[in-house]
Amino acid sequence: MTDMKTADSLSVPNRRVIIGSIAASIAFVMELTLVPLLLPGIQEQFALSIGQLAWVFNSYGISVAIGVLLGGLLGDVYKATRVFAAGVICFATGAAIVAFAGSYELMIFGRVLQGFGGGVFSPLIPLLLTRSSPHRPGKVLIIWGSVAGYVAAFAPFFYGNTLAENGWTYAFVIIGIVSLVALAIVWSARLDDRPPSFDRSLSSYAELLKSGRLWVMLIYVFCTYGSITYFLFRLPLWLADNGFQVASIGFTLSVMWLSFSVVSTFLRNLVDEPHVRMILMSAPLLIAAGFPIAYVYPEYAGLIVSSILVGSGLACSNAPSTQLILKFAPRGMGAASASLDITCARLGGVVTVALLAQSVLAYSFVLVVGLSFVAFTCALVAAKKFD
């Protein structure tokens, strides 16, 4: 009973770190979900070509990829809260520059700075969360994931129906304010999070490369997130080609994100070690089942079922994979491993979309099933000891 009480109770500083970290994640997710909605307004205001607009979108993603690697490296060497603070400040400053940019060039600079900052602090979020809740790391990670999912589902709908008429700049102002509030909450905890004095020479990074089970989980992330990213990319285009209206497409994607959040909430008390393997194996099965349903039953009901299955698969993949990646990381390499987690997820999406963007849907489903099989095998191998 005493052990259970210790596991469920958190100190005030730890609670603040958890709340602040999740708030920072909300700002990060708002950027991902709102910016596609804002692109037409940005294009109109600055009279941009499609190529220039693509740079507005892609400059952020490229900077995130660079920032993630640096954030993971620095988070293992210096205090995670300080590195987190530096990333959030860059992110918020970049958002402000974008909001008040008077030229295309200044906007690109703001997007680069914002993306770099987001890349620096984003891999530290799971690290701060698990350090603040060491007895129930899986629970806090799944709460984080479910909150992010609800924000992803409702942010575009809320902004589009309340503030969109006032222009696109308000979105970046709100994103910047939310990130700074998150930083204030984390900083007020005054957490002493000095990294353990482990060896971080080249040999320690060699240990990272030698961690077989860690890399098995990274392959799992590559395959599952690659499949899900392709679903998010391909489904709206396919629906538009088949005469579906924008509102119907948006609703279908919202169903996917809501399914992710609801299932994540349901799993929050099941995600720790006794159930990890079962949950991990469920993810690729759900993803593989969701894709052909959208193809075989293209009616609206079939698309909703498909979105529910893929969203549920994302929930079953998200927190457990992060939990095991941090668990399998060599001592003192937690932040570096978290950055590899994010990098593999993004790389899986980029590679899968690049390979399948112009393929026939039937062929793409075959490859998705293949990726799901690889992910299922990885789950069997990596979580073997949790039977």
Q: Residue ranges of each PLM-predicted region?
A:
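Extracytoplasmic
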Residues: 16-50, 71, 231-236
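Helix-breaking motifs and short loop linkers at transmembrane-helix boundaries and internal kinks
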Residues: 47, 79, 100-106, 117, ...
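Conserved MFS/SLC helix-loop-helix module at the cytosolic interface between two early adjacent transmembrane helices
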Residues: 65-102
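Helix-to-loop junctions at the C-terminal end of transmembrane segments
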Residues: 68-79, 262-275
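Paired small-residue
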Residues: 94, 105-114, 301-309
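Cytoplasmic helix-loop-helix junction between adjacent transmembrane helices
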Residues: 110-148
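Helix-loop-helix hairpin linking two adjacent transmembrane segments in secondary transporters
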Residues: 135-138, 142-187
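A late C-terminal transmembrane helix in Major Facilitator Superfamily
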Residues: 328-361
